[in-house]
Amino acid sequence: MAKNCLTLGELDRERIADIDRRLGLKLDGSPLAATTANRIRIVARASVQSAIDAGAVPADVWPQRSKTRARRKVARTKRSVDVRAFPSPAAMAEAIDAIVTQQPGSKTYRVMTAVAYYAGLRPSEVVMLRVRSTELPAQGWGRLDVTEADISFDEPGEPKTGPRSVPIPPVLVAMLREWIRQNDLTSPDRLLFRTRNDTMPSGSNWARAWHRALESVGQRPIRIYDCRHAAATTWLRAGMPLAETARRLGHSVETLVSTYVGALDDEEHVGNQRVDSILG
């Protein structure tokens, strides 16, 4: 320990900057996933802060976070989606079915897109679903347990906002039951979506297949991630309570309202009607 550790007196800005850089690397020098590196840096910075509070090292030795990056993060949190850009539920269903072509992997991309829309999952969560993640009854609604996400190229981790259980409608239940049967997915640990070479489906190929399908049915291009936004918009306009919508998406209610404010335009009229019914 004495040979390989710095003393508190050696913790100056230059050395801390080098430590901060190295905390973002694996032992072989390749970069860690951003979320993993951030988690490690938080622990390291807390340790240094304890030394600062005790007066053992000068204050503010840790590299300051980029203000530009911080501003970008604030802007992202305040950004709301344009709910008018999303196709109707019927148009979404038509576009999802149109994904299937003669192209390799098109059937996989169809089911993946259906999961993104009908369950409101992030693409990173879709690709990490396993057989054991599914509850698929012969009739009625089912459920997906969202416990993993592809947080980097191929490194699994927890979903962005933690594990959650998401109800799924019968149309998606039937689709997943047929998918599991067709592909003989019997192992509980088996990932639902893999290529013929048993690798992770390509995000770029998925996006291209989706854009071709949208174009073929006369719809404007939207991102795969926008399927999640379209799901939230559909749920809110159907009258799903804010808290339940937020839970299914893995959001706080505050984030939900700020992101999908355009889908809540009808709430004022509905609210007025309910108050009128009470006031007489």
Give the positions of each predicted feature.
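Basic/aromatic-enriched alpha-helical hairpins
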Residues: 1-31
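Basic, Lys/Arg- and aromatic-enriched nucleic-acid-binding interface segment
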Residues: 31-34, 38-42, 56-123, 127, ...
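Short, charged phosphate-coordinating catalytic segments
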Residues: 49-61, 116-143, 243
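Conserved tyrosine-mediated DNA breakage-rejoining catalytic core shared by Y-recombinases
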Residues: 64-72, 128-181, 254
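Active-site/catalytic core of tyrosine-dependent DNA strand-transfer enzymes
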Residues: 88-93, 99-100, 148-152, 169-220
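C-terminal catalytic core of tyrosine-transesterase DNA break-rejoin enzymes
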Residues: 114, 118-125, 205, 209-214, ...
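Short, polar N-cap/turn motifs at the start of nucleic acid-interacting alpha helices
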Residues: 133-141, 221, 240-261
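Catalytic-site neighborhood detector that most strongly recognizes the C-terminal catalytic loop/helix
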Residues: 150, 249-274
